[in-house]
Amino acid sequence: MSEENSSSPPKKVRIYSRRGDLGETSLFSGPRVGKDHPRIEAVGAVDELSCAIGLARSFGLPEETDGILERIQRKLIEIGTEITAMTPGRHAVPTIQPGDVRALEELIDAAGESLPPLTSFVIPGGTPPAAALQLARAVCRRAERALVVLLRSDAAFSRRPIAWFNRLGDLLFVLARRL
């Protein structure tokens, strides 16, 4: 390596490619699809959910709640990768296993034990972290709907994430009530 090369400034990394300027994007599995494709809609909703959870976490939640939500964000990244990497017509090993749904149910039950019974609809608000978790719950329901559309358009997509997102919405609701 010459001295000339070692003293040159590091190459800047461009975040833009211009390849999506006409409304298409690439999947990890290779093909290009429209940005309104069910897979892109679903992965976008999953990404928005992770961002909404991140917003809630930024308010400084109790350590246990923060840990739960961080693990969920990591799972959401795996799910997003699964959505964009799956090959049409080929079943992949799903990210969500039956035990994952049961684990959310156990968290819901434990978090809800100390809460008073509901006597009316909950109006989102209260504390900033509770409001942020309610927003995350609403985004979760949108992601769930996007996954239903994806399942209808591509039977190779596993049904398990739909149940997981259904429980996740319930968990976010219960966690918001605790704040």
PLM feature spans:
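Phosphate/pyrophosphate-binding loop motifs in nucleotide- or prenyl diphosphate-using proteins
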Residues: 1-179
